[in-house]
Amino acid sequence: WIMGHMVNAIAQIDEFVNLGANSIETDVSFDDSANPEYTYHGVPCDCGRTCTKWEYFNEFLKGLRKATTPGDSKYHEKLVLVVFDLKTSSLYDNQASDAGKKLAKSLLQNYWNNGNNGGRAYIVLSIPNLAHYKLITGFKETLTSEGHPELMDKVGYGFSGNDEIGDVAKTYKKAGVTGHVWQSDGITNCLLRGLDRVRKAVANRDSSNGYINKVYYWIVDKRATTRDALDAGVDGIMTNYPDVIADVLNESAYKAKFRIASYDDNPWETFKN
């Protein structure tokens, strides 16, 4: 999965997919009442990027729905996964469940079209703080109470805080999560970070009793780092330059081993080599 980073304006969906992304990451900020409000990152952000592009969250969802609904004039067949980077650090811990409930309602109405031929992309809810795990339970409860528990088949989870892998496993247990786990590791492109924790995550993914289904690394903008991440065995790479990742995947060393994921590749299944 080539994951376009910080895609917060509707116009950027086309831009990143046309550069080679089959997945995008979108920032979601919340108001004081735990309503998802804007797709917005703010300052500071990655080096070389504009930090301030934004939409109202529900409007972004409508644009995203068009981009992922077959038959729509804006449809992109290859856009198959969306990571919502949930900026919950502005909330109190006890608001996490409410944030999950409100997020589920927004997605149900504006993205899934109340279960009636909505957008088809898989969704990863990425949460920065382990203490906010109740966002997941609130989300799940709401889709169930609104009569659409089947949509949970399209939803996965990630904690983005670079926490100890054992602590993340315990938190999923508390949240009742037993699959659909995308584990991320990384740092802003302005800084360097080694691949030690990525290798630990890959080892967990590939062990018989691991909880991780997919591992992705962020933020990768250079060819050399892309090769290092692929050599470490990641499933996804988040980038500001999807075309760079696509170029490396076309190199003879990687062409035989990797391919771009399509809609038929289940993002919740651990790939067995």
From Swiss-Prot:
Q: Which domain of life is it from?
A: Eukaryota
Q: How is the cofactor bound?
A: Binds 1 Mg(2+) ion per subunit.
Q: Can you quote a single GO CC term?
A: extracellular region
Q: What is its EC number?
A: 4.6.1.-
Which residues are glycosylated according to the annotation? Answer: N250
Q: Which residues form the active site?
A: H5, H41 (nucleophile)
- Keyword set, alphabetical order: Cytolysis, Dermonecrotic toxin, Disulfide bond, Glycoprotein, Hemolysis, Lipid degradation, Lipid metabolism, Lyase, Magnesium, Metal-binding, Secreted, Toxin
Which residues are recorded as binding Mg(2+)?
E25, D27, D85
| This protein's name | Dermonecrotic toxin LdSicTox-alphaIB1aiv
Q: Which organism is it from?
A: Loxosceles deserta
